[in-house]
Amino acid sequence: MAVRGPTSIVVMPLALHRLLEAPELAGHRDMWSAAPRALAARHGLVHTRAGGADCVAAAGLPGLRVLNHALGAIADPAAVERFFVKQGVPARVGVPEGSAAERAVAARGYERDLAWMKFARDPRAPVPEPETAGLAVRPVAAGDAHRMGELVAASFGLPDDLGGWFAPLATRRGWHCLGAYDGGRLVATGSLFAAAGGGWASLAATDPAHRGRGAQGALLAARILVARRLGLRHVVVETGEPVGGRPGTSWRNILRAGFLPVFLRPFWRSTPA
């Protein structure tokens, strides 16, 4: 399996790939299982295992990639495709670059879509101390859970009511939700889900009025320290591959926090019949 390092391409054993995917997949499952029933019914939120993969769909929001995709060890692409056909949304599968699964979906006529780059780092390594413009980083208070949900929903382009999906994660077991505060107001957030000896950094969101103040750099550093305190062996995070060869702000923040790119995960999309 090809791995894109800072200066070279090496081969990653499948076992290592699965090790680095495990915290994200566990967090993904837990987050979807936490969706309130009323919201799940309203938007057609469904998650299941099919064909060896973790499959999620939002029938009411078919155009949102973040809510309609399959991840994990895809062993039976046909079974994965049947899941999406049943939900009435296009199939989007995230597969390791250069893998047998990627070749299988390409053979089914799928088209390559956007890709996510996976990054990893050892939480025991030195952690940068990013500067923030007057922001304080601390755990999200229970009273700010609703605000956290609002920020996450807005950041991912989701309907406002789906903030009620993410808000309970602030106090849910396994989740460590941190916030950047301007005085007493929560203006940015980021979470760490701990599982399988690793941590998945996710749900990064910043109020647009407070961008450029170093919030996400500080939140990444704080989550690395949480992972260290928990005794985790690695922290992983992902972001979209550069468009036009120009890394975005998220990519640059991740590198500054000491993460290294470890593998690319392309998404492949089914084509209309």
Predicted regions mapped to residue ranges:
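Conserved beta-hairpin
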Residues: 46-52, 97, 103-108, 174-188
